[in-house]
Amino acid sequence: MQKPAKKALLLIVAILVSAPLIMEAYTRWSPAFSADMPAPKASTKRLILLFHGSGGKDNPAMLQLEQTLREKLTANDSEVIRYVWSPWSDGRLRASTNGLYLGEKIGAHLANQNIRELHLIGHSAGAWLPDAVCASLRKYNSEPVKVRMTFLDPIGIKGFLDFDWGSQNFGGCADFAEAIINTNDNVPGTNEPLQRAFNIDVTELPHDMNGHEWPVWYYTQTLNGMSLSMDANHFEMPRGAVAKDVTASAD
C-alpha cells in the first residue's frame, strides 16, 4: 500500500474510532447554568411537578394533563406546577445531562419548604429530572418526604452510547414509581420497561395520535384516585413488572 493511501486509511480509522467518543463527551458535558426554580406556595404540602420533553414546552398533551390535574387536585394545601425547562431540554443529545443537573438544583431549592408529598411526572426527556430532584430533596430536606414518580414514554438514553441507563435506573429514588410506555413508536430509548418502576404497556390499545404522546393522553384519560394516591406501593405493583393493556376507569 502506498504511503498516501495508508495515511488516508489511518485517518479514516481514527475518525471512526474517535467520533463516538467525542459525541459521548459532548453529550455528557454540561456547563453550569442558571434557571428559574419552581415556586410553590408557602402553604403547599402536596406538590405535583410536571416535566415536558425535548421541544415540548407547549405540548398540547402536557397542557391538557396539567389542566386535568388541577381539576382533580383541589385541596388548599395541594398544588400543580408544570415546570418549563426549555431551552435546556430542547437538544436531545444534551437533555439527559442538563436534566440531571437541573433536577439536582430543583431538589435543593424545594428542600425545607414544608412539602410532605411530592409527585414527579416526566414525559419523554422530562424523565431525566425526577430521580435527580428526589435524591437532592432527600439529601437536603430535614423532614421525610413521600415521593411518587410517573414516567410517560420516558427516553432513557444517557449520553450518546448508553441506551439502557434509563430502563435500569429511572424510579429508583421514589417510594413508588410507575411508567406508561408505548413500545412501537419511533422515538429511540423509549421502548423498554423500567426495572425500578411498575410498568403499564399501552402499545396495543387503539388510538389515532402520535405514538410518543399516546402515553400522556392515556394517563390523562384514566386519572383516578389510584393514579394520584400517595399510598400506592410496590408490594401490590412490583418494580419491573409489566401490565399490558390495563385501562383504569376515570372518576
Language-model features: locations:
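A conserved mid-domain beta-alpha-beta active-site/ligand-binding segment of alpha/beta enzyme cores
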Residues: 198-224
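Alpha/beta-hydrolase-fold serine-hydrolase catalytic core, especially in secreted/extracellular enzymes
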Residues: 214-216, 221-251
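Ser/Thr/Pro/Gly-rich low-complexity linker/stalk segments immediately outside membranes or between
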Residues: 25-45
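Short beta-strand element of the alpha/beta-hydrolase
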Residues: 45-53
